[in-house]
A protein has these predicted regions:
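Jelly-roll (double-stranded beta-helix
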Residues: 1-158
Length: 158
């Protein structure tokens, strides 16, 4: 698959409220809804805004699932987690999130994609693509973001 980018307005993504938790499906499918964002594999990504004392569940229809606490404190499985924590759930385990204070949580999951290779800021399922990306980066052939193009980090020599 070729690299790509697409922008989707938040208002165009499925949103719902249940038990005072406001959720938006950013990508994939969950709870009978499907986002318009094109994906390359089965997955879900949900943004959940949780008032204090509310509860939400992580969909369990994919083998790999996690929750990232973007803000606030939550309780999951009797343990307390805070801003910046990532919780990975065992396959098939029930996963409920309780907000101990106002919290924002990203719920993510999907199916394994196969082997991935990582080198510096490059991730691919192909070693050859990583080598090409390293060469393109070092030669200045990669376009930097419009609003973040003044600093250029050299590829680290190992």
């Amino acid at each position: 698959m070729e690299p790509s980018f697409a922008h989707h307005e938040g208002a165009d993504l499925p949103a719902w409220e249940e038990g005072h938790v406001r959720s938006r499906l950013i990508a994939g499918d969950a709870f009978g809804l499907r986002a318009t964002v094109k994906t390359q594999s089965p997955l879900f990504c949900i943004h959940a805004a949780m008032p204090r004392g509310t509860r939400t569940v992580v969909p369990n229809h994919y083998s790999e699932r996690a929750a990232h606490v973007s803000a606030g404190r939550v309780e999951i499985g009797g343990r307390i987690f805070g801003t910046g924590d990532m919780i990975v759930f065992k396959q098939g385990a029930d996963a409920a999130v309780l907000a101990l204070e106002p919290a924002t949580v990203m719920l993510i999951g999907g199916e394994p994609l196969g082997e991935r290779f990582i080198d510096w800021n490059f991730v691919s399922s192909s070693r050859e693509r990583i080598e090409q990306a390293k060469a393109d980066w070092s030669a200045g052939r990669m376009k930097l973001p419009d609003l973040d193009h003044e600093e250029f980090a050299l590829y680290p020599v190992k």
